[in-house]
């Protein structure tokens, strides 16, 4: 909007911001952490779909076992890793601290623990593959050990970041609760 003083009205150059109210930092932290957790949950869901598809295709004999290998033992408990994400999603709308704590603990049990067990389960096979070049399980022509280790590296990062942002969100909610109690 043009004014008589020039192209910009006086007082709209951003110099008058100091007196304005600002959003409290714990609200900013809460909003940004919720956003990151939602993005990570989408990535986790995509990883979960890949694992569930491999388990389903293998058990329903939709394709030959030469094309898609039988699942490793760690993949079955990992299918429960969707539960912590669901509980975390329930915690978000009303800032429910107890649901978020349950989500964080169950993420360790149902998401991270199966991945650690899987790394230990597949280590001898990975060692054999890299020492002797022999693989006995394949997923679409690729070594199943290599494919699953790649998936596990991505999954462990996703779950670690989910737990990290959940902790930041929990801290923001506790700060908000403490400030309300002080008033």
UniProtKB/Swiss-Prot annotation:
Transmembrane portions of the chain: 40-60, 67-87, 100-120, 138-158
Function: Endoplasmic reticulum transmembrane protein involved in vesicle-mediated transport, which is required for neutrophil function.
Signal sequence bounds: none
Superkingdom of the source species: Eukaryota
Protein name: Protein jagunal homolog 1-A
Main location: endoplasmic reticulum
Annotated Gene Ontology cellular component terms: endoplasmic reticulum; endoplasmic reticulum membrane
PANTHER family: PROTEIN JAGUNAL HOMOLOG 1, PROTEIN JAGUNAL HOMOLOG 1-A
Keyword Protein transport: yes
Keywords: Endoplasmic reticulum, Immunity, Membrane, Protein transport, Transmembrane, Transmembrane helix, Transport
Localization per record: Endoplasmic reticulum membrane
